[in-house]
Design a protein with these regions (language model features):
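Long, charged amphipathic helices and adjacent flexible linkers at domain junctions
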Residues: 281-299, 452-483, 598-642
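Duplex nucleic acid-engaging cores and interfaces of nucleic-acid transaction enzymes
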Residues: 49-52, 59, 63, 68-318, ...
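Long, charge-rich intrinsically disordered scaffolds of nucleic-acid metabolism proteins
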Residues: 96, 401, 407, 412-482, ...
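Short beta-alpha connecting loops at secondary-structure transitions
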Residues: 18, 341-348, 371, 413-426, ...
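Low-complexity, acidic/Ser/Thr- and charged residue-rich accessory regions of DNA metabolism proteins
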Residues: 139-153, 207-208, 245-251, 255-270, ...
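Accessory alpha-helical DNA-binding modules that contact the DNA backbone or grooves
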Residues: 30-31, 46-113, 118-147, 481-624, ...
Length: 715
């Protein structure tokens, strides 16, 4: 197989692009590095295309390796023919390769094997030829043998039938046909193990839909219901059509004596061997596709969450709400440094409201707090009411935001949090995390396992390794899109930088602590175990503000410093002029990009990137994202009425819709059918996590705590 050609076709890119990307990946370059600094070679392939290419490259190479193993195994058995070898080499999927290998694959002891050991294969061949002019029983009598364990004529025929059934099952063409027809005409059906039992799976108690239309989130829901012993799930195939096909393929002559036996063999082969196997394969395939879709949605949601814009220059009060143990508060300055912590008890059972209000007023005055970040967990509603009442009394302009605290408790009990705040208890660490995730979501959320951040669906039911790798890739892409400040970034953030692992991240922090702030990117080469390759991969994503070389504060890669210097000189600028916030209009001064790029010895794409960076150094892509809604008043669910129009924040996007926070402690659901007037395949075509959207209330169910929203017809 020509892997490069296959990749180019699948991803709709040029062959030269696929070839260059594969070469760069094989040379050990990271996806963020290739996407940012090797655009010339790849024709500007972005990180998403490169990650898809990398994933498919691994699959196709694994496929080729498996083909080689299968060919070698069959050759060793001296059963390899040129036709079979060609079929294996031309196979496009692992399933197709395994189908071709099935007849030659070492098996556990089957009924057919036992029959062969009893010497019944010649009888199976006789039946298969369909030429006998006398009853098969007559020929079978010759195979009855006490020594071989064949006690009767019927036992001999049954053994021959078992051999024929396995031959039918091992036929790759038959399996392909049955797999395709089951996928296209089969029905996935579920029923309740106990119809009287109340559960979240009630809609699946008597449920069926065509296999080919089974939506990913429903497949995962059925799997979970089955695993929790609430549902029985099966695939109903068009059995009559399948048996008709098998009979047509295996019965070539209408022979009075062999036709009934062959029909029985075909039916047995399907019901005992092929059917259950194909059902397992299809269920596995549906699950894999559903997981793939869920991982993509999770990844997109995570990206939007990580790329929320930081809130700069404000002192934030982090508030971790609770009842019995009290609300933990942490004051964090504009750089993320913890100024103070305290525990207050305004909620039940202690209800020390006045004492708590006094502490809050003192904190707001003392630290000039202008923003309160409240976790959305237990006692969040009661905490919000206390804050709103307080804000009405004080003169200071203070706002608050309800923050998704998913993962805060996981982080606060982690080894990392213990190392960061050894003197704090779990609640204090959680309050700090809640404050910081509003100030700089990316820097804080990288400390938490992405699976704990709470923006996925069925994430605990899927392949954890696959999910973990995909989400790690998302975090890596986000960190490198934004870049990091080499002198303030934590080890948790640094480890996601291109070319940097956990060890190197810790070594960078250790070097910084021992030697003071980095003054130059070149100093990275003095960090233990950080060699030239790691430097090449990471340097462009590390920024130094106020360093020896102004270019170190940009995303211009050190390999392009010479070209950038010559460009500045050519246009009449000095490097130090960069420190003033960029050289506006520099890109317009370059009249002929092609000629200028040739003069500088770089590519035209690289020149445009350098010019853009000199114009606006280290621009933050998060600045273009929607900012969180800052509130100063409270809304109750009982206040909601159909027809009300509100502004809300998209908290989670799933296959069938999006959950929107409208400020009432219960996210409302905008079903996919209520998002736009035009047809969309997936909610992500209309919204993303973090989007600020206008919604209208459709209905409110106070008992079930459900809010239905629409985005249609909202002005």
């Amino acid at each position: 197989m020509d892997i490069i050609k296959k990749l180019a076709e699948e991803l709709s890119i040029g062959r030269h692009q696929a070839e260059a990307a594969v070469k760069l990946i094989d040379e050990g370059n990271t996806i963020p590095f290739i996407a940012r600094y090797r655009k010339e070679a790849t024709g500007s392939l972005n990180d998403e295309v490169l990650r898809n290419l990398d994933e498919r490259l691994k699959y196709l190479r694994n496929l080729e390796d498996r083909k080689s193993q299968v060919i070698a195994s069959i050759a060793e058995q001296e059963k390899l023919t040129p036709e079979l070898e060609l079929k294996i080499k031309e196979a496009q999927t692992l399933v197709a390769v395994e189908d071709l290998y099935r007849p030659y694959k070492p098996k556990r002891r089957t009924r057919a094997m036992i029959a062969k050991e009893k010497g019944l294969e010649p009888l199976a061949d006789l039946i298969s030829m369909q030429m006998t002019a006398e009853p098969v029983e007559k020929a079978a009598a010759g195979f009855v043998s006490e020594e071989k364990g064949v006690a009767s004529v019927q036992e001999a025929i049954q053994g021959a039938r078992d051999i024929l059934a396995e031959r039918i099952s091992d036929n790759a063409a038959f399996r392909t046909y049955i797999r395709n027809i089951t996928m296209n005409k089969g029905v996935i059906q579920s029923s309740a193990k106990d119809e009287k039992a109340q559960s979240v799976y009630e809609m699946y108690y008597n449920y069926e839909e065509p296999v080919k239309k089974a939506a990913g989130h429903r497949v995962l829901a059925l799997n979970r219901g089955e695993n929790e012993k609430m549902l029985t799930v099966k695939i109903l195939a068009p059995e009559e059509q399948i048996l008709g096909y098998l009979e047509k393929q295996t019965i070539v002559r209408d022979n009075l004596y062999t036709t009934p036996i062959l029909k029985e063999a075909a039916a047995d082969s399907y019901s005992r061997l092929i059917g259950p196997s194909i059902e397992r394969e299809i269920r596995s395939d549906l699950t894999e596709k559903a997981e793939e879709g869920a991982i993509k949605v999770f990844g997109k949601n995570l990206e939007q969450l990580l790329m929320q814009p930081p809130i700069v220059g404000r002192v934030v009060l982090g508030w971790d709400p609770a009842f019995r143990t009290g609300c933990k508060l942490a004051v964090v300055d504009s750089t993320g440094k913890v100024l103070d912590t305290v525990v207050i008890y305004p909620t039940a059972p202690q209800n020390k409201v006045e004492e708590s209000r006094k502490i809050l007023k003192d904190f707001i005055k003392k630290y000039n707090i202008s923003l309160i970040s409240v976790g959305n967990g237990t006692a969040s509603r009661e905490s919000e009411q206390i804050i709103v009442d307080l804000l009405k009394e004080i003169r200071e302009q203070v706002q608050y935001v309800i923050v998704n605290e998913a993962g805060a408790s996981v982080y606060s009990a982690s080894k990392l949090a213990t190392e960061e705040f050894p003197a704090f208890d779990v609640g204090q660490r959680s309050a700090v995390s809640i404050a910081r995730r509003l100030q700089d979501p990316l820097s804080e959320l990288v400390k938490i396992d992405p699976k704990s951040i709470g923006v996925g669906q069925y994430q605990h039911d899927m392949n954890q390794k696959r999910l973990g790798e995909a989400l790690e890739g998302v975090v890596e892409d986000c960190v490198n899109k934004v870049g990091v400040d080499l002198n303030t970034a934590s080890a948790s953030l640094l480890e996601y930088v291109s070319g940097i692992n956990k060890t190197l991240a810790r070594n960078i922090v250790a070097y910084r602590e021992e030697n003071g702030a980095f003054k130059s990117r070149k100093q990275l080469l003095k960090v233990a175990k950080l060699g030239p390759k790691a430097f090449e991969q990471c340097a462009g994503f590390m920024r130094i503000t106020g360093g020896e070389n102004p270019l170190d504060g940009t995303s211009v890669h050190p390999e392009s410093y010479d070209a950038a210097g010559k460009l500045l000189e050519k246009l009449g600028y000095k490097p130090e002029e960069l420190s003033g916030g960029g050289l506006l209009g520099i890109s317009r001064k370059i009249k002929d990009y092609k000629r200028t790029a040739q003069d500088l010895g770089i590519g035209e794409i690289t020149l445009r990137d350098i010019a853009g960076e000199l114009e606006k150094p280290a621009r933050d892509p998060r600045d273009e994202m929607p900012r969180p809604i800052l509130r100063s008043d409270i809304l109750e669910m009982k206040d909601l009425e159909p027809g009300m129009v509100l502004k809300g924040t998209v908290r989670n996007v799933i296959d069938f819709g999006a959950f929107v926070d409208i400020g009432v402690h219960q996210d409302g659901l905008v079903h996919i059918s209520q998002m736009t007037d035009k047809y969309i395949k997936h909610p992500l075509e209309a919204v993303s996590v973090g989007d600020i959207v206008d919604v209208k209330i459709l209905s409110v169910d106070l008992a079930k705590k459900r809010i239905s929203l629409t985005m249609k017809g909202v002005k």
